[in-house]
């Protein structure tokens, strides 16, 4: 979750979720092997105008979540990576839970709503319930949790990936 500092105290829930959506989009674009992310790629991924994206990137940069250099690109800072990693993990775990445990086909809007409000404990419980999966339904890596996926869990994950 984005930290609640004195200046962030007045950020509403929708604004926090919107900021997290940008961080998630940047993570996913970087995950595709790109060294930097371009404003146009974020605009396309989130179906937003370039000026809207630039405005949010300036805000994320000012808060220390990204490094945004006009004309060059965007990178996540360690602070931004922590949040993006959590959101991506939550999203991918929720997709798997919906598909495997509930039998409900993946619904992007529902999954997106859950990812912002899922506690670390809930994410760990879902991860454990699913057998510590390494990949989501799309074959993308699921980031490991902060206190989840211990060494023995990782061995279990690797065995399930290889043999089951």
Predicted features along the sequence, with ranges:
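Short, Lys/Arg-enriched N-terminal segment that forms or immediately precedes the first helix
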Residues: 1-14
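Key DNA-contact positions within bacterial/archaeal DNA-binding proteins
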Residues: 51
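A short, conserved structural fragment
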Residues: 61-71
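Basic, amphipathic "hinge/linker" alpha-helix immediately C-terminal to the N-terminal HTH DNA-binding motif
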Residues: 72-90
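C-terminal regulatory/oligomerization modules of transcriptional regulators
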Residues: 113-164
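N-terminal helix-turn-helix DNA-binding core of bacterial DNA-binding proteins
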Residues: 11-48
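Short, hydrophobic-biased segments on the C-terminal half of alpha helices
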Residues: 57-58
């Amino acid at each position: 979750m984005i930290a609640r500092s004195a200046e962030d105290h007045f950020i509403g829930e929708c604004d926090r979720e919107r900021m997290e959506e940008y961080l998630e989009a940047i993570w996913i674009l970087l995950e595709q092997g790109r060294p930097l992310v371009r404003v146009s790629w974020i605009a396309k991924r989130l179906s937003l105008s370039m000026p809207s994206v630039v405005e949010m990137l300036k805000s994320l940069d000012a808060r220390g979540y990204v490094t945004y250099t006009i004309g060059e690109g965007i990178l996540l800072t360690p602070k931004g990576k922590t949040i993006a990693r959590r959101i991506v993990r939550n999203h991918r775990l929720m997709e798997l839970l919906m598909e495997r445990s509930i039998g409900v086909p993946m619904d992007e809007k529902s999954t997106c709503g859950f990812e912002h409000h899922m506690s670390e404990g809930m994410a760990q419980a879902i991860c454990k319930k699913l057998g510590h999966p390494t990949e989501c339904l799309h074959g993308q890596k699921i980031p490991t949790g902060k206190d989840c996926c211990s060494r023995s869990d990782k061995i279990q994950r690797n065995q399930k990936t290889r043999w089951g």
